[in-house]
Amino acid sequence: MEGYRLKEYSCFTSAGACFILSVVYVASLYVWNSPHNRDHPSTIKKRFFSVFIMMFVSPLFLYYFSQEHILQKATLWQLLGLRLHGLLPAIVIPMFLTMVLFLGPLSMQGFSGLWKLYAGIKNVWISGVNIFNIIFEAEPMYWMSNLTNLIWLRNHVVAPLSEEFTFRACMLPLLLQCFRPMTAVFVCPLFFGVAHFHHMVERMRNGLDFKRALMISCFQFSYTTLFGAYSAFLFAKTD
């Protein structure tokens, strides 16, 4: 595949590749001529297929626009962050750091007992005394119902995985070969945030006026960009 790689390279090329990849990712969601909204099962299934294809297309951008000396030092899998060496700390440390950031909601769910719904723990009481817990007995249908819920799968599985893979794993290595690490960390999420403006079209179709739809989209851009910077920082530090 060496003959299909870009020979000349610049920072503009890196940023341009990320921009094009963002456009292609969003465009893949709208290639289907569907009269239904984004939450309709047929629309969700079609978009699942689109992002599945993008999981194969996105690494091609990374390979084609990567500098030759970088690919000589690391494989494409390693650039994507998929490697065995250091994988465990790369998973555990960011997970605990993220848990610290969400310590408030986690504490509230812990005190209220709501976490038992997710863990499937049932208290067994005898004469008013909690004797022991039974695992996976409280609400077994909670996870089963969610795994068959297309909207839940989209919001919690498919969208996060495909977005992180495309906007982090495939874009950040391109920017890191040109920009300083911290610069790349803050530039990369801009593509991620801007990509969410396509939801503005859906909101206007649902009857929301332009000004209101724009305000909501700008707010969404703010928090998705902020989260994207945090995610990009974790990726850069654990790569």
Label the predicted regions:
Residues 1-160, 173-177, 236:
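Specific transmembrane helices
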Residues 26, 145, 149-239:
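Transmembrane helix-loop-helix hairpins at the membrane interface
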